[in-house]
Amino acid sequence: MKQFLTAAIVTLLMTAGYYHLQEDDTNDFERWALKNNKFYTESEKLYRMEIYNSNKRMIEEHNQREDVTYQMGENQFMTLSHEEFVDLYLQKSDSSVNIMGASLPEVQLEGLGAVDWRNYTTVKEQGQCASGWAFSVSNSLEAWYAIRGFQKINASTQQIVDCDYNNTGCSGGYNAYAMEYVLRVGLVSSTNYPYVAKNQTCKQSRNGTYFINGYSFVGGSQSNLQYYLNNYPISVGVEASNWQFYRSGLFSNCSSNGTNHYALAVGFDSANNWIVQNSWGTQWGESGNIRLYPQNTCGILNYPYQVY
């Protein structure tokens, strides 16, 4: 009888603990959903909560490791599987398209310190649209205007998404093609042509207000990219498949050196680590930025183009 009571008590405690853990998981999910304005049907809610808890455990296990150089954290992507994240936020990886101009001779750097242009353009949120290529170009334009002392502008990314027919809107594109469009047509203000995170019919029938003089390929080596970053930020192609839950630190966990996303290189630190501004909002990363190890980490040297 005593053994039976002991077993019953242990079972009761284990069951209570299990339900307590389940309740904690549910509460965490509910808090996340409220913070991120996510609303689900009852059937989808169970599915999304399962993904949330799986991602949460993966993040916790990663952060407990002593051999990692970066931390993961919860963000707006918590209820997306890795496959869904790649499909919704990144474009198809394509390293076969040759958009590169003439190769550059390697620049010899002397006495060039750290560079940081983060304060010259604001972090944007692309939403569920693979438009990082367009944001990297419109943000390049904004930073160029600000650094040259012209004015603080908000260039329309949606205009590039809708009207640059050499690219494919929310399905992806290439920074050099987008810069060619800005060179020919110019951009209007985002106030007049706001971002909606989806493909639309082009609404711009006249030339824009903000133009560039040209653009050039500035990659091929660490020293080249650093040299040109000393002037202005640079639109770069990157391989971002594993960026989903990046929170802070130095990142090098790239799936390859291909290109499935575009972002804005805004500087480098005294240890030559790259500082890259993304377009996934400030809840992601280091207030919207990621730091990458030097050299060609995540393919950053493959498709860097700079406006001038």
From Swiss-Prot:
Keywords from the named record: Disulfide bond, Hydrolase, Protease, Secreted, Signal, Thiol protease, Zymogen
EC top class named in words: hydrolase
Signal peptide (residue range): 1-21
Pfam families: Inhibitor_I29, Peptidase_C1
GO molecular function, one term: cysteine-type endopeptidase activity
Catalytic activity entry: Specificity close to that of papain. As compared to cathepsin B, cathepsin L exhibits higher activity toward protein substrates, but has little activity on Z-Arg-Arg-NHMec, and no peptidyl-dipeptidase activity
Known role: May be involved in extracellular digestion.
Protein name: Putative cathepsin L 3
Protein species of origin: Paramecium tetraurelia
Lineage of the species this protein comes from: Eukaryota, Sar, Alveolata, Ciliophora, Intramacronucleata
